[in-house]
């Protein structure tokens, strides 16, 4: 179909074949040069998107538009006489336009984008339906197609066969379900209703594929136990051993006791009763018994075959030597039309070189031609496919192959039928053909099957040589032909050879003059005696070509067999292959080990990094929590600070303004040194308990406040003494109002006035000296002794007063002690600000630090 041509070799009135394959056509114009008598139109391998302008081809019987870009198929709706429609490998998404095609018998829609299959129900005459390699998820209703014989659904996404009994026609004989998504082997039970099913394919489904978790099992006997009339499964003829196992599973075993959903239980059972055996030594005792029974049966069948062959030799020789004496040369086409076809033979003819597809052609032969060519000597089973090819390729990957032939040659259309790989030649009306085929199938299972095939092929070649030489010699001696007739016949032969069918259909035995000598038997060629002399050189050349083809086929067979035998039975080769596998395995293990080590190292590094980050985050979180708790505590204490206490400065490093800016004397310098020492001592005591965090809550910040309080305490005592001695009462004035703003103003005025008072400066120096002594005593002694010492120091601190003022001083001190005892809450607040224990510091028990009295 690769070259565009118009086949006009048919008889007038029978129509013609128009082939426009590979012409780069994108559309079918209105001026389509298609005559009314065209019965076959081939448009393969173009760029056609839409079928249009086909209405004038009303007599069209066969249409092929494969490998194009069709999206819809409504263009075929008006071709009511169509019998063969070939539309594979397009982009058709829906089946349409088939309502009026009541004569359609052969439909191929493989390799499209179909999702349903119910739209073909209107084609009730359909016999062959190919819907492979689509997107069909479930079996559709095609029960109205009562004439359907072949249904191809491989390469889809079918998951269940539950609707098969209701949706599939009963007369179906060929069913392909390979390469789908059937996961339960028990689904095969739904095919038991197809009583005429002979060929089935279930391969490359998940339910029959080997998995590491499931032991190996042979599913073929189980399928045969449900489909009792099955002859071919997954492209291989069912052997008698498998039939016996299937019968045992059906009658005595548990083959039919499992239901859909029990796939695992079924597989485990089949692994025990039908295990996979790769060598003869692994066969069980039951298999050995079956093999013994079958070997005896094959022996008797071979004896019967040899007897039947001897009986047929004599009538075959008589037919071959019979010569039809006709007064003039007649064409093969005329003789064929005169002879009525009496037999139809379905045979394998080969593999297409372009599409790699298997197909069979239905041929019509006269009775004499059938008796001569298709004798039992020529019937034998050959399998040139190696085991590796069977494992690596799908036996049903082939699709329906369209081959146009003349409509007048066969009363039944379509003329192309699909058969699964491995089917042998079958004679439909011969009772002994089935027995012979079974004998040959069993013969292939023998240990010496190769020798028998070689002997049979050699005998066929020798017989062919003898027949050709006998016919040529007899024709040369008995039927001379004029020279002019020989030349004209030779020219006519060459002319018809140029217009013959494609090479892929060369063995289809079509009745064109080009391949009539190749397809017809020597007995058929005896009808044309005047053509024998013209064909003698061509016959000799064909013999050489045939011998070369046979030698090439034999070489290929021998190479395949030697390779298979070496790989499986040669110990040295098996050892080398085993070493290679071990080496590859070791290298793979080393590579995986390195990868695991690298991943483990990365994991450890990541773990260490994660641990460090977690520790850092945990440490920071603890710090934040401690700071937040400390800040909350400080804020609570500041909130509970009494309103009569002046605000405290938060900066220790801020310079303290001098108390005596105008009058500097040695006593003021010494007072400044004592103040600095007291500040440093207070900072040293508070540093271990409260680190500097930036908040205004350090204990050392209270030193100015304490100093002011002590200053005011001393001033009040001095003022009382001055009032007793007659000094001026205007020096110190107690302020009773404790308002915070008035206190701050009065404190600043008092500071300015006290800086100008030399007497107040002397009193402050004496007070600081007493405070320093109290601090030293507190560090050296326990709390009780320190408290006693503090009282004695406070009692005897003013040494410059005379005896008359001592009594007054003791009275003032006792008054101050009473005031201190009346304000324990203020002492408690000061101690909480410093972070000390609940009891007050004994060094400050004699001081009134909670009450601030500012002089005016």
Curated annotation (Swiss-Prot):
Residues 430-451, 498-525, 646-672, 737-840 are annotated as: Disordered. InterPro entries: Cilia_flagella_integrity (IPR050576), Leu-rich_rpt (IPR001611), LRR_dom_sf (IPR032675). It is found in: Cytoplasm, Cytoskeleton, Microtubule organizing center, Centrosome; Cytoplasm, Cytoskeleton, Microtubule organizing center, Centrosome, Centriole. It comes from the Eukaryota. SMART domains: LRR_SD22. LRR repeats lie at residues 37-58, 59-80, 81-102, 103-124, 125-146, 147-168, 171-192, 196-205. This is Centrosomal protein of 97 kDa. Residues 300-742 are annotated as: CCP110-binding. The modification Phosphoserine is found at residues 308, 410, 497, 521, 755.
